Amino acid sequence: MKRETFAIADIYVPIKRRATLDQKRVDEIATSMLDKGQQAPILVRADGARFVLVEGLHRLEAAKALGEKTIFCFLVDARRH
């Protein structure tokens, strides 16, 4: 897979996924991102003009908390559940 950069605003987080958010984990990852940058890309799948988060909710939310406009992603071919 090739690492790509996507606009955070173009990534949709499913409601079920949002329910699993742990703010403490987001804060820990944000601190790590400040020190080391984003270490692991998130996974997204294409859905028309937008992208849907497959994996990496806490990394995505940490990037948002830091005011980032883009994030490293891997575009995967995943099916809806």
Residue map of PLM features:
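Short, charged/polar connector segments at secondary-structure boundaries
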Residues: 1-77, 81
